[in-house]
């Protein structure tokens, strides 16, 4: 009975991740779905195990990505579309896989930095599709987007993936209030600093004389 409940719970995490992943794609991605999808996919990996989670999630995520991006991908045949969609999903799953494998070697709250670091560095090392599918594409909060002026779009992605790692660490350490509190405080301080920087920049860096009418 316990095994059945565990299986259903893990399936629930993956299902939620896939639903939010679907709404993260397409030509009108929903920003809240972009933030939530990694939380549940990471939860699925951490409860399931690296290899099993990878091979279960891979075909399902490929299907979701292909449905969400239908009509957007410039490939002449289904086989080519399937190949590149699969390759893209493999790239996107590697951080989850490696996080599950390596997290045991990382002490305490520092574990929260492993997943976002992997999620940013792996596409950089292996190559990616440029800004296609970038997390920042779904964001329309101008204060938050000011971070791009310093870090590029990778900074937005780091925050999104770090959120997933922080939420999962708090979930796992809910009986250890000290670690959960320290992780939460550190995350909120950084998020507040990023947002404050954005608000200040929006209010102080606007010069009408340096602007031009782009449309209308």
For every predicted segment, state its role.
Residues 2-215:
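Membrane-embedded alpha-helical bundles of multi-pass enzymes
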């Amino acid at each position: 009975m316990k095994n059945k409940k565990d299986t259903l719970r893990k399936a629930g995490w993956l299902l939620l991740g896939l639903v939010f992943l679907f709404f993260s794609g397409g030509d009108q991605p929903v920003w809240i779905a972009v933030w939530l999808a990694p939380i549940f996919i990471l939860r699925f990996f951490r409860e399931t195990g690296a290899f099993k989670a990878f091979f279960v999630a891979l075909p399902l995520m490929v299907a979701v990505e292909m449905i969400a991006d239908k009509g957007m991908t410039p490939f002449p045949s289904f086989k080519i579309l399937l190949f590149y969609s699969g390759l893209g999903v493999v790239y996107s799953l590697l951080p989850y896989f490696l996080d599950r494998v390596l997290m045991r070697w990382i002490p305490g709250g520092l574990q929260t930095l492993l997943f976002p670091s992997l999620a940013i560095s792996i596409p950089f090392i292996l190559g990616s599709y440029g800004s296609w599918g970038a997390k920042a594409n779904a964001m329309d909060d101008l204060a938050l987007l000011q971070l791009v002026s310093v870090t590029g779009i990778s900074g937005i992605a780091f925050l999104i993936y770090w959120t997933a790692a922080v939420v999962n660490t708090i979930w796992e350490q809910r009986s250890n209030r000290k670690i959960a509190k320290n992780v939460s405080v550190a995350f909120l301080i950084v998020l507040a600093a990023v947002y404050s920087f954005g608000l200040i920049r929006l209010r102080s860096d606007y010069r009408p004389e340096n602007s031009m009418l782009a449309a209308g």
